[in-house]
């Protein structure tokens, strides 16, 4: 059965009050990294109910843009230094209203991969002749027959990261609920994160993340042979392992550390690479308090890119055969080591983007980005639906909150296994579900 989404023509939402305009705001060194400036992040947030959500959200966006006025501007390189910057033009954010001719349950709450409604119908569009890479943010609100709605965004990663996205969407929700000002005041200060001077970077800092070629499995980078699967992980079991780790190792680890260790080991065992083949695990760390500690107020507010990738590498045989707590320790120590570095080393140590192989795995923790707190007046989202990150990193996994409020499980969604390894991967992960 096919379903149809009917869209209105895109319309510009401008700030509801006058905002600073006619000047250029610089972006940070992180913001200007090549793989971020051309990365349009597509995402859907699924809500169970809402009364005229498009109208409410449209008005809230206009109010939020007073505080987040750079989002109403345009990305440009027409500057004195030729660097990517934001021109504060006040033009506004493109907004699309849409209706779907079905209920959310008819399309499984947009949780099936591929989507039962083509993602192009769910995502905001822009008028012909407009360059999407100049737009910080576009929004579409789609109302379903059941009363639920989807809040979809397309955002240029050069302007904000995942934590920034959460902060912005929470602010829109606060405006929708009648607040006059966002609880967290937005902070720009992009010029603090400057391009590092080579002499400031530690000589031991890694700058090349190339892995040895993986020749013992065929892997294409077009996602056609990658299977999507999900697991509901028991928090009771994970907390039990955390307690055991604390007793045996004498240190405290997080839920993320335990899940990530189990995931890395399970996948490494399932894909069966040669023991000497190097495998990698990459995840993001928030370094706001390290590089911006003198600039940020106590409640934060910086919404630019400040999540850095931490790449963990080890021989396949070591990860497959080590006790789980040893892998937890490796992950925890890598995190602690990175956060002990000084600001210059953190900024200068950003690894260049490399095309990944099947030996590489990445994980993103969507529970901690603030997105679940984006409440437009009818509660937070039931589901988050990232639509394109796994096409960039290839072997990706995501941690979500359980959509059932009474459950304390963590939902793990993976795009990291080819079909021939799926059964073995599920078997390895089963004792965590």
Swiss-Prot record:
Q: Which reaction does it catalyse?
A: myricetin 3-O-[beta-D-glucosyl-(1->2)-alpha-L-rhamnoside] + (E)-caffeoyl-CoA = myricetin 3-O-[(6-O-(E)-caffeoyl-beta-D-glucosyl)-(1->2)-alpha-L-rhamnoside] + CoA
Per its UniProt entry, what is the enzyme's top EC class, as one word? Answer: transferase
Catalytic residues (UniProt)? 157 (proton acceptor), 375 (proton acceptor)
Q: Which tissues is it found in, per the record?
A: Expressed in young cromes.
GO MF annotation, one? acyltransferase activity
Q: What is this protein called?
A: Myricetin 3-O-glucosyl 1,2-rhamnoside 6'-O-caffeoyltransferase AT1
Q: Which UniProt keywords apply?
A: Acyltransferase, Transferase
Q: Which InterPro entries match?
A: CAT-like_dom_sf, Plant_acyltransferase
UniProt KW Metal-binding keyword: no
Q: What family is it from?
A: Belongs to the plant acyltransferase family.
Query: Its pathway?
Result: Flavonoid metabolism
Q: What is its EC number?
A: 2.3.1.-
């Amino acid at each position: 059965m096919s379903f149809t989404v009917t869209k209105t023509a895109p319309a510009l939402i401008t700030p509801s009050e006058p905002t600073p305009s006619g000047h250029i705001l610089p972006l940070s060194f992180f913001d200007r990294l090549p793989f971020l400036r051309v990365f349009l992040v597509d995402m859907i947030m699924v809500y169970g109910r809402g009364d005229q959500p498009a109208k409410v959200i449209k008005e809230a966006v206009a109010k939020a843009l007073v505080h987040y006025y750079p989002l109403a501007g345009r990305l440009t390189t027409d500057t004195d230094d030729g660097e990517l910057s934001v021109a504060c033009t006040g033009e506004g954010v493109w907004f699309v209203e849409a209706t779907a001719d079905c209920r959310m349950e008819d399309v499984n709450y947009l949780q099936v991969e591929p989507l039962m409604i083509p993602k192009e119908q769910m995502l905001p569009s822009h008028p012909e002749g407009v360059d999407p890479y100049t737009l910080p943010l576009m929004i579409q609100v789609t109302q379903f027959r059941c009363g639920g709605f989807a809040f979809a965004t397309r955002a240029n990663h050069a302007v904000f990261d995942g934590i920034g996205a959460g902060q912005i969407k929470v602010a829109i929700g606060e405006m929708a609920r009648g607040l006059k000002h966002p609880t967290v005041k937005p902070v720009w200060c992009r010029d603090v994160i400057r391009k590092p001077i080579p002499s400031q970077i530690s000589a031991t800092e890694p700058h090349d993340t190339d892995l040895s070629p993986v020749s013992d499995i065929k892997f294409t980078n077009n996602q056609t042979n990658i299977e999507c699967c999900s697991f509901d992980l028991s928090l009771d079991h994970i907390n039990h392992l955390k307690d055991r780790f604390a007793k045996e190792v004498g240190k405290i680890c997080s839920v993320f550390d335990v899940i990530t260790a189990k995931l890395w080991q399970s996948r490494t065992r399932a894909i069966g690479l040669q023991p000497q083949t190097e495998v990698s695990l990459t995840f993001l760390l928030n370094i706001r308090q390290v590089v911006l500690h003198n600039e940020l107020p106590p409640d934060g507010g910086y919404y630019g890119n400040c999540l850095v990738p931490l790449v963990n590498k080890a021989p396949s045989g070591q990860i497959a055969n080590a006790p789980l707590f040893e892998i937890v320790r490796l992950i925890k120590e890598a995190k602690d080591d990175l956060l002990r570095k000084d600001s210059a080393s953190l900024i200068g140590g950003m690894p260049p983007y490399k095309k990944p192989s099947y030996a590489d795995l990445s994980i993103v923790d969507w529970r901690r980005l603030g997105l679940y707190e984006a409440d437009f007046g009818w509660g937070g989202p039931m589901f988050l639906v990232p639509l394109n990150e796994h096409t960039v990193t290839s072997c990706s996994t995501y941690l979500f909150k359980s959509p059932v409020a009474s459950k304390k499980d963590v939902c793990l969604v993976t795009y990291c296994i080819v079909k021939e390894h799926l059964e073995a991967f599920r078997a390895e992960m089963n004792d965590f579900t």
